[in-house]
Structures are given as structure tokens and as C-alpha cells.
Amino acid sequence: LVDIIAALEPTFGGINLEDIKAPECFYVEKKLRERCNIPVFHDDQHGTAIITAAAVLNGLRLIKKDIAEVTLVCSGAGAAAIACLDLLVALGMKRENITVCDSKGVIYQTREDRERMDESKVRYAIADNGQRVLGDAVTGKDIFLGLSGANVLKPEMLQTMAENPMVFALANPQPEIWPPEAKAVRPDVIIGTGRSDFPNQVNNVSVSYTHLRAHETSLH
């Protein structure tokens, strides 16, 4: 795949990678960036990360919370989730304030399958604090970031979150929790989804291709 895409370099000014699963997407993007002299961008990772970071920063401004102090739980540990977390950390969120859950539950340092985890997951493994499932991890958190599956955030879980919680339920087509359901149990929630039929859409379609700008060209 890397060889095929690299062979297209003379024809295009930039390449967007789409729908490559983790961990293969990390390898493909890295190798192409090493070989190509044009921008190579994996939209599922970085497009999602850019729009999610914008949503988080705007939400924090509204509720007057500091990115360095808030806590976050992430449901999902694929390419998009890891890219979002990496960008949020780069913007000032403390890694120790982040808890990540995959399909097996909370990712912690002594979990029995740690040796088989992708490096990207291991980076976000927390010290064992007894939390094992999403329902444990979400308690008291300021932010829920969902890049996993439909209806995984139950109303009773949302009720345990901190004051003025932010929920980004980005699974498509069905989010981790529906906005009306979230508002019913937590009127103080700020909620965004990946869908265009609800307010506060958080979707990489808002970023796609606007991040690529030509600085110079050899065409005349």
C-alpha cells in the first residue's frame, strides 16, 4: 500500500488517507511522510482530532474550566481516539487526567493483555486504581469523549459526571448517547455528536481539505 500511494506523489499536491484501521494507519502514514515531499494526512485521525480539540477548547471556555485541570474519559482506543488524545495533551491536558477504555474495559498498566497492546494504547495506560469498566471510569469526569459504539454511555453513567459535563458522542450513525437522552438527565451538559441533525456537530467533514493550503507551485 505504501509503495502504491508513494508512486502517485508526482501527480498530486497532497494525499489524504481514508479508512485505514489502527495500528496499520500509523505505519502507513509514517512511512509515506518519510518518502513523500507532499503533505500526507490521515483524515480519520487528524481531521477528527482537530475538530474535537476545537470543540473541547470552546466548551471549556463556556464553562470556565482549565484544560490543565479537567479530567477526561475516552471510550474507544482506535486511531481517531488516540489522535484526539495526543492533540489534547499537546494543548495542555495532563496525560494523568485521562482514562481510556477499549472493548475490554479500562486500559491500565498491569492489565493481563498489556504485552499485546499497541504502543499507542500503552501510552495511555493508567496506574491500577481498581477501575475496570467505563461505568467506573466516567464517575467524576469533566469530559466524555466517545469514539466507540452506539449507546455505551448510559444515562445513569452521565449522572455521575462532574458539574457542567461535556459529552462528545462521536460514533456514527448512532452516538454513544443521544442528545435528548443526555439533556433529560443532565440539563447542564454540553453535548456534541458527529451528526448534522443535532446542534454542535463535531465531525471531521468540517475540517477535511481546508487544512491543506498551497504555499508554492511549479505550475505556470
Model-derived segments and spans:
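Glycine/serine-rich phosphate-binding loop and adjoining beta1-alpha1 elements at the start
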Residues: 1-68
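Rossmann-like NAD(P)-binding element
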Residues: 112-158, 162-170, 176
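Active-site nucleophile and cofactor-binding loops and adjacent substrate-binding regions
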Residues: 41-50, 73-77, 196-198
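Conserved small/polar residues in nucleotide/adenosyl-binding loops
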Residues: 210-219
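Rossmann-fold NAD(P)-binding glycine/threonine-rich loop
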Residues: 171-202
